[in-house]
Amino acid sequence: MPTINQLVRKERKKVIKKSKSPALVKCPQRRGVCTRVYTTTPKKPNSALRKVAKVRLTSGYEVISYIPGEGHNLQEHSIVLVRGGRVKDLPGVKYHIIRGALDTAGVANRKKSRSKYGTKKPKS
């Protein structure tokens, strides 16, 4: 605990909060163009082919984004909307592509958690 005199001489340091998604530059989402769409394998205990895309954002950053859901229609030069949110078993993937926005189609035949995958309500 500092004395009053110590605080007069040197003020307390401000705590700087470091962003977990710096490429979005204080925005909730960012538009971008896919430069490469490919699959990659996850870290040690898991095994799969995870679909990811390299995206050039309007902020000027180039980031690797995860494509959630089963199947997708993305290819090079597709316009996508990117949000924050990392994928724990893919190192370097700190962003998600939003399904059902811009050029990204929603997940087909999805019944539950539809809003997260951009799927319209099925005609009952």
From Swiss-Prot:
InterPro entries: NA-bd_OB-fold, Ribosomal_uS12, Ribosomal_uS12_bac. It holds the Pfam family Ribosom_S12_S23. One of its GO terms (molecular function) is rRNA binding. Keywords: Methylation, Ribonucleoprotein, Ribosomal protein, RNA-binding, rRNA-binding, tRNA-binding. It comes from the Bacteria. SUPFAM superfamilies: Nucleic acid-binding proteins (SSF50249). The modification 3-methylthioaspartic acid is found at residue 89. GO terms for cellular component: small ribosomal subunit. The keyword Metal-binding does not apply. GO terms for biological process: translation. With S4 and S5 plays an important role in translational accuracy. HAMAP family: Ribosomal_uS12_B. Part of the 30S ribosomal subunit. Contacts proteins S8 and S17. May interact with IF1 in the 30S initiation complex. PANTHER family: 30S RIBOSOMAL PROTEIN S12 FAMILY MEMBER. Belongs to the universal ribosomal protein uS12 family. This is Small ribosomal subunit protein uS12. The gene is rpsL.
